[in-house]
Structure formats: structure tokens, C-alpha cells
């Protein structure tokens, strides 16, 4: 099962594309184990979670070993998928891991102000439009964004420890 390129809802490596391939592989009585060929920088954590959930469920149902083979890159959400394998194999120079979360919105409010353009935003709450790149960022918005990133990164790290804890080096 090839998981190549960015993982995302509109990408080739989407849950919608990958899960049927997983189901076919696991459901084939001639297949003794499933190999995940991973070469991906990661991407959308929800898509990775959907793929991971499918792998976990299919492993339990069909009792087949899963091996993740990471070629050049198995980072972030791609590593999240690899965590569901019974074994992870990577080359000496494979880039593996990149555990955590990132949010990198643009801040364009000062740039558009220079050309005398402004966007009016009407939102039902103070933080409803906090990722809007055309509005100034307040310390409260910065704190909220960092809190969300820390929370997502914490979830990811806990999953790594739960699934790979014995294999991790100090």
C-alpha cells in the first residue's frame, strides 16, 4: 500500500484513496501481511487518523502483520500512520519522525494596509476568525494558537509513546 506525497483530503494519499486499498489488501486471503510503502512529508492529521483507525481495525479483524517501510521520508502525519505497523523499517538516511504539530498562518494585515485595503470581519466570538491573515494578531490570539498547537503535539507524542514506547531510545 503506497502512501506517497502529502497526506490530505484532496491529495493522492487521502483516507478516501488509501482505505479501500487497505481493505482490499487485508481482505485478500492470499496476502499474509501488509506493507505500507511510505514516502511522505506528512500532512493533515485527521486524514492520518482515519487511515490509522482503518489499519488498526483491519489488523484486528484479519490478524495480519503490518510492516511500514519508510523510503526517503516518513514525517509528521506519515509517521503517525507508520505507528500502526507492527514493525517500522527505514534506511540509514531516511528522515523519520518530525513528531509534533505546526500551525503557520500568514499575517498580512500590515501589507494590505500599505495599499489602503482593509478587511472587515464579523464573527460570533472573539477568537472565531483568529486564523484570518488580514486582521491584526493580539496576544490573546497568539496564546490560543500556541495552546492548540501544544495540545495537538501532546496528543501526537502520547500516541508515539503508547505505540512505540518500548522501541524508543532515551
Predicted feature locations:
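Small-residue-centered hinge/linker elements
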Residues: 1-65, 73-163
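Short catalytic/ligand-gating loop segments at beta-alpha or beta-beta junctions
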Residues: 166-170
Amino acid at each position: 500500500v503506497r502512501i506517497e506525497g502529502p497526506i490530505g483530503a484532496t491529495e493522492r494519499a487521502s483516507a478516501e484513496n488509501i482505505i479501500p486499498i487497505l481493505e482490499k489488501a487485508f481482505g485478500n486471503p492470499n496476502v499474509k501481511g501488509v506493507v505500507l510503502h511510505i514516502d511522505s512529508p506528512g500532512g493533515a492529521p485527521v486524514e492520518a487518523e482515519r487511515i490509522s483507525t482503518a489499519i488498526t481495525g483491519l489488523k484486528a479483524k484479519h490478524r495480519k502483520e503490518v510492516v511500514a517501510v519508510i523510503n526517503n521520508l516518513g514525517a509528521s502525519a506519515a509517521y503517525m500512520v507508520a505507528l500502526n505497523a507492527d514493525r517500522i523499517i527505514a534506511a540509514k538516511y531516511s528522515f523519520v519522525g518530525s513528531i509534533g504539530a505546526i500551525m503557520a498562518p500568514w499575517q498580512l494585515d500590515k501589507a494590505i494596509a500599505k495599499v489602503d485595503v482593509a478587511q472587515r470581519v464579523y464573527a460570533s466570538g472573539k477568537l472565531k476568525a483568529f486564523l484570518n491573515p488580514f486582521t491584526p494578531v493580539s496576544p490573546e490570539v497568539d496564546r490560543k494558537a500556541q495552546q492548540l498547537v501544544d495540545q495537538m503535539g501532546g496528543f501526537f507524542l502520547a500516541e508515539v509513546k503508547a505505540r512505540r514506547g518500548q522501541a524508543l531510545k532515551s
